């Protein structure tokens, strides 16, 4: 659903939108429809009844609408400073037992991530010191060093791309970045949502082998461009970062962008940095509802920052008509998703689509 927890520069854990590869100015309801449809599909995945799924989706849309109404009455600075602190989050209508259980699990996850993401933990897992200088370990097929055939034009001299990235950083962050020196870069296999794009991990070291791991991810034209027009940004990495800085309440200090010698655009951020994502497999109705409302809260806050909250709230109104309309769309989308998946599986079985099934 493109929402999750991550660390702020102050090392607090907040909940927010965490994937903005397609970000572009567009109608607010497109994002809300996508969230509502995702919740409906998640409910079906959990084998919840259609009536339960519809109630959860309606609750999620209502949360968005009511939060947006509140933002419409708030001072501009208060909207801008508002954030969802995961460790202090209070669900306004959730079951106290569910909230308490979720908070306990969250505290355990946060402690696990803190241990996993400290440099002393990451460095020995990702870096080998067997050669003349530190080097990222090859772990094919997930992490490997590119050849010219694998990545035409990527080359081995990244000085121009690094200099361009440095220029994209705020001046005060450049002072910090200049303490680190580039040592290595390796290709990193991306997730399902980014298949076909290039992603790499860069190793930078300061004094005493103090590491900084940067993820360099390809940014292509937004899928929204055919419907909204081209981005105002010449570099699509800049488009992603501009949207991220606008809509997130706090962002990675190393967010930046660059362009490779092969003409590809990239955006840059720290690798990992205490990222928390939802694992819904063992969830029940109450937990999905709570998570969906948190997503709606984060989305409404992002839209209130980037748009006019009062205008959006006025468009949605104070009744349930808007909620029901979005819910109807989400349930129909879920049905279409189910039909599409069945057709996909059928095509595999009939040999019309090749697929590799991992054991």
Task: Please place each PLM-identified region on the residue numbering.
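Conserved ATP-binding subdomain of kinase catalytic cores across diverse folds
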Residues: 1-115, 160-359
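Long, low-complexity segments enriched in small/aliphatic residues
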Residues: 87-158
């Amino acid at each position: 659903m493109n929402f999750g927890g991550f660390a702020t520069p102050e090392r607090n854990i907040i909940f927010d939108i965490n994937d903005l590869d397609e970000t572009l100015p567009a109608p607010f309801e497109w994002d809300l429809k996508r969230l509502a449809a995702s919740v409906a599909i998640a409910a079906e995945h959990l084998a919840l009844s259609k009536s339960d799924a519809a109630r959860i989706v309606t609750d999620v849309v209502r949360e968005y609408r009511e939060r947006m109404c509140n933002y419409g009455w708030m001072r501009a600075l208060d909207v801008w400073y508002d954030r969802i602190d995961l460790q202090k989050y209070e669900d306004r209508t959730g079951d106290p037992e569910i909230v308490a259980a979720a908070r306990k699990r969250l505290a355990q996850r946060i402690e696990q991530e803190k241990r996993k993401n400290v440099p002393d933990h990451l460095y020995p897992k990702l870096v080998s010191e067997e050669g003349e200088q530190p080097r990222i370990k090859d772990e094919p097929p997930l992490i490997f060093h590119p050849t010219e055939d694998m990545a035409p034009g990527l080359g081995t001299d990244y000085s121009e791309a690094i200099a361009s990235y440095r220029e994209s950083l705020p001046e005060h962050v450049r002072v910090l970045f200049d303490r680190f020196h580039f040592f290595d870069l390796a290709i990193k296999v991306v997730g399902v949502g980014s298949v076909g794009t290039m992603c790499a991990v860069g190793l930078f070291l300061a004094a005493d082998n103090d590491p900084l791991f940067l993820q360099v991810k390809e940014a292509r034209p937004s899928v929204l461009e055919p419907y909204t027009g081209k981005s105002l940004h010449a570099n699509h990495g800049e488009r992603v970062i501009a949207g991220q800085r606008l809509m997130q309440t706090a962002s990675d200090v190393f967010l930046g962008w660059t362009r490779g010698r092969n003409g590809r655009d990239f955006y840059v951020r720290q690798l990992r940095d205490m990222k928390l994502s939802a694992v819904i497999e063992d969830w029940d109705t109450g937990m999905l509802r709570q998570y969906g409302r948190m997503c709606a809260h984060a989305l409404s806050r992002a839209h209130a920052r980037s748009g006019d909250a009062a205008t959006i709230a006025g468009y949605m109104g104070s009744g349930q008509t808007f909620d029901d309309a979005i819910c109807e769309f989400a349930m129909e989308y879920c049905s279409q998703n189910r039909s599409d998946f069945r057709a996909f599986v059928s095509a595999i079985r009939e040999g019309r689509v090749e697929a590799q099934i991992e054991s």
